[in-house]
Amino acid sequence: MLRDGNEGMSTIPGSSQIQFEGFCKFIDQGLAEELHKFPKMEDTDQEMEFQLFVETYQLVEPLIKERDAVYESLTYSSELYVSAGLIWRAGRDMRKQTVFIGNIPLMNSLGTSLVNGIYRIVVNQILQSPGIYYRSELDHNGISVYTGTIISDWGGRSELEIDRKARIWARVSRKQKISILVPSSAMGSNLRDILDNVCYPEIFLSFPNDKEKKKIGSKENAVLEFYQQFACVGGDPVFSESLCKELQKKFFQQRCELGRIGRRNMNQRLNLDIPQNSTFLLPRDVLAAADHLIGMKFGMGTLDDLNHLKNKRIRSVADLLQDQFGLALVRLENVVRGTICGAIRHKLIPTPHNLVTSTPLTTTYESFFGLHPLSQVLDRTNPLTQIVHGRKWSYLGPGGLTGRTASFRIRDIHPSHYGRICPIDTSEGINVGLIGSLAIHARIGDWGSIESPFYEISERLKEEQMVYLSPRRDEYYMVAAGNSLALNRGIQEEQVVPARYRQEFLTIAWEQIHLRSIYPFQYFSIGASLIPFIEHNDANRALMSSNMQRQAVPLSHSEKCIVGTGLERQAALDSGGSAIAEHEGKITYTDTEKIVLSGNGDTISIPLVMYQRSNKNTCMHQKPQVHRGKCVKKGQILADGAAIIGGELALGKNILVAYMPWEGYNSEDAVLISERLVYGDIYTSFHIRKYEIQTHVTSQGPERITNEIPHLEAHLLRNLDKNGIVMLGSWVETGDILVGKLTPQTAKESSYAPEDRLLRAILGIQVSTAKETCLKLPIGGRGRVIDVRWIQKKRGSSSNPETIRVYISQKREIKVGDKVAGRHGNKGIISKILPRQDMPYLQDGTPVDMVFNPLGIPSRMNVGQMFECSIGLAGNLLNRHYRIIPFDERYEQEASRKLVFPELYKASKQTANPWVFEPEYPGKSRIFDGRTGDPFEQPVIIGKSYMMKLIHQVDDKIHGRSSGHYALVTQQPLRGRAKHGGQRVGEMEVWALEGFGVAHISQEMLTYKSDHIRARQEVLGTTIIGGTIPNPDGAPESFRLLVRELRSLALELNHFLVSEKSFQINRKEA
């Protein structure tokens, strides 16, 4: 973080800084730490020794460019080389070689890694910090029971418990409790040592009886007793070295490893001075923990808050990558040992090159990035989505919580989150509170804690000094809130300010303040910081808004927001969507593909992104903003990216809105829009879809790419070139062939029916030796072919198939069924598109663009949209833009209202339009019905709001089925749009049909259109021949399936058709 000494303010750190710094930490420290743990290996006869010389490891720069790796589906990685030596002890001879260990995926400056052509990001995980935690619970008698929980570095738990008789018990992995003396003796302490190292020896001596004293009389007895309780082994086990090794491996090495952070926490909590390199639980730790537990029992000491951030740690990308690297080295060690044993057995002379293979490291990282829950595909819907994804944190994942077991207390916000975790930005649904976003200034410290910056206030310092504090440290300071930024020193000394102290919010004098916040946005995430007037919105609506901004689609013609918060430029810069000048110079050439910059005796060519597809099928494109001959400075923007205008984030459009009902078309959050938004390409966006096909070598021969496809109409093949691949620039419709492919198959005449063979003989048709397996354009994929990539397989590689990828661009205007949203949680679906002349219009004749339901505001309590649309109208008329910091009521009461109304009054005067600000109903205006020309009865709130089109579009969701595939078991239509499935008619839908009395429609839904096989066939035949469709006879397939399942339970269920005739016959027989 940089600091401006003149103004006392600081610039916002880069949003991808946490990810990139974590990866650099892994490269600088983590690699060397794990390589130093790699052991020296000997054969069984100790004639040969293998070791790695880790001081000379090196990473090689990748040979392929990052952009090429995307198109060829490769991993952008670096090769790791280490010096290895093989020593023969007989001749004291050593052979040293540089060996290839494997590939390590690299991270770019935006904090993302490219694996198999897909950008991925590693989410930070929050875990319980290793150490000891004390808590109190009530037993069934209402008596407090104090327990101390020891959490190991990998998450294992052991408990110490003191009962009402002051007896101390130990419980390992929630199993049966045993006396504290048993594990202490098993760890190597005798009874005399225990009594000499505790503060309350009389309590330790009070409860062991003769039988228990015998168990701890010697280490062997204590180990046997502890092993019997820990492993739940019955009988009388015998002490042996193998038993000790098993106990050492399964308990003391796994469940008692505290790690570097756990050792530090244990020393601080129990006032110990054990060296930091002692990362395992010691007898001294157990005895000190028991002493502290006794003090808790008698009212000394404080209990721990497990949800406080000081008791949490961040498992960052550095930790995860280091863990995977250590796992890969363990696998490599096993491979090397096996290879050495095999070479000795076959009397071969191995070399370091023969012993070391790159497979363990490469496959471990591929598995980690592809399968680990914390490794996620980078969300690139728009620039904001990308930077927010890099600052996410999660309680979920290996060693963490699950969405169904996490309690409300864990999900809730905590006072220690202030300035570290955003209280607004979190997921909706089952993961609410378990996945969130770091605050805008937060960073991850060396000990895995989340640190936040503050200004230290001291009389001895002439200027305020900025310090980063962990949650453990700032708990003991009085921290002033951000409102003190607006006060000069003279006013501050007389001021009483709100402050935070020991998880409480107080109001104290300025002289007692130790620290103050550095920025008004300090406690919000990037997404929440982009919402103007957020203080006037309900927190639930602010949460929805911060999530929906990440779903906004980049528009073909974006626009800066009139009302913003000032962070739009920072967000656009951190996203990496813009092209930035790396040094001063002069533009010597520019076009749509590249910009050439000359300066400092060097000329660099900056390639631009042209119609690149994101993983959400949105279009990423850069537009040059500088001309030839222009001089630029370092850091200046050369080209704007998608959803970026003038270096600022631009996710939507400023449009004229009105809050009024209109013939019921905007009820229940529906939105009425003008056709101007369609024909003027106001909300037009481009989407790029990727379709691919592979050619394999089958048992009958290789598949062929060709344009000569038999038995297909020429119309479907019109866009193919001579190679059988669709031509660039072609307009393709649903069902068109994109790539022609033939798969060889066996030609056997006996496989055809007799009449088929007769027809072939009469017509002279040859038996086909190939099957058509072309790539066809699916439903909803119509568009323009903008790129075709044919990825050839490498030489000498028969396993990797050739891949052909076709990229098709779609232009989508806004239409009925699309979802739009503002920045205050005000979302809705387009219900109707009205002609311009029918839309309500203002007193100057301007038609409104969107009509919202006013009933959506009082119940949702998102009043911020009212302030935004009113001041947006003033800004549009005055040609001004506003950047408003949230919580402006810190300066005075009704500050937002006092800002908006004078601007409206000023706009009314300058434009000579008195209707802009009418004192009787400020912010409202009388508007007219476009159909009749009559004014509406009541004045209506009008204004300019910033509205976004979201990724939830009707083109991706609308679906219809006339015929399709059926499930084999139930014979019902498949489910889902991707499988061309049908819509389920369930119980409630049947009830609705019964309520209307539509018997024939109900019968069709449950038989002909569903799972009555014979009725389906009869409908098809009757439709072709003509005539009346017969009624279905017999039971549908799902009922027959139920009968079969009941038969498997030895229950017989018979069914028969009851008609008027059969009913009369049965009646006579009775």
Curated annotation (Swiss-Prot):
Instruction: Output the Pfam families linked to this UniProt entry.
Output: RNA_pol_Rpb2_2, RNA_pol_Rpb2_3, RNA_pol_Rpb2_6, RNA_pol_Rpb2_7
Output the PROSITE patterns linked to this UniProt entry: RNA_POL_BETA
- Per the UniProt entry, the Enzyme Commission number(s) are 2.7.7.6
A GO term from the CC aspect: mitochondrion
Q: Which coarse location class applies to the principal site listed for this UniProt protein?
A: plastid
Catalyses which reaction?
Answer: RNA(n) + a ribonucleoside 5'-triphosphate = RNA(n+1) + diphosphate
Q: Where in the cell is it found?
A: Plastid, Chloroplast
| Keyword annotations from UniProtKB, A to Z | Chloroplast, DNA-directed RNA polymerase, Nucleotidyltransferase, Plastid, Transcription, Transferase
Query: Which CDD domains does the UniProt record give?
Result: RNA_pol_B_RPB2 (cd00653)
Q: Gene3D superfamilies, from UniProt?
A: 2.40.50.100, 2.40.50.150, 3.90.1100.10, DNA-directed RNA polymerase, beta subunit, external 1 domain, DNA-directed RNA polymerase, subunit 2, domain 6, RNA polymerase alpha subunit dimerisation domain, RNA polymerase Rpb2, domain 2
GO MF assignments: DNA binding; DNA-directed RNA polymerase activity; ribonucleoside binding
Query: What's a GO biological-process term for it?
Result: DNA-templated transcription
| Subunit architecture | In plastids the minimal PEP RNA polymerase catalytic core is composed of four subunits: alpha, beta, beta', and beta''. When a (nuclear-encoded) sigma factor is associated with the core the holoenzyme is formed, which can initiate transcription.
Family as reported in the entry's similarity comment: Belongs to the RNA polymerase beta chain family.
Q: What does this protein do?
A: DNA-dependent RNA polymerase catalyzes the transcription of DNA into RNA using the four ribonucleoside triphosphates as substrates.
Q: What is the name attached to this protein's record?
A: DNA-directed RNA polymerase subunit beta
The organism of origin for this protein:
Illicium oligandrum (Star anise)
Give the encoding gene's name: rpoB
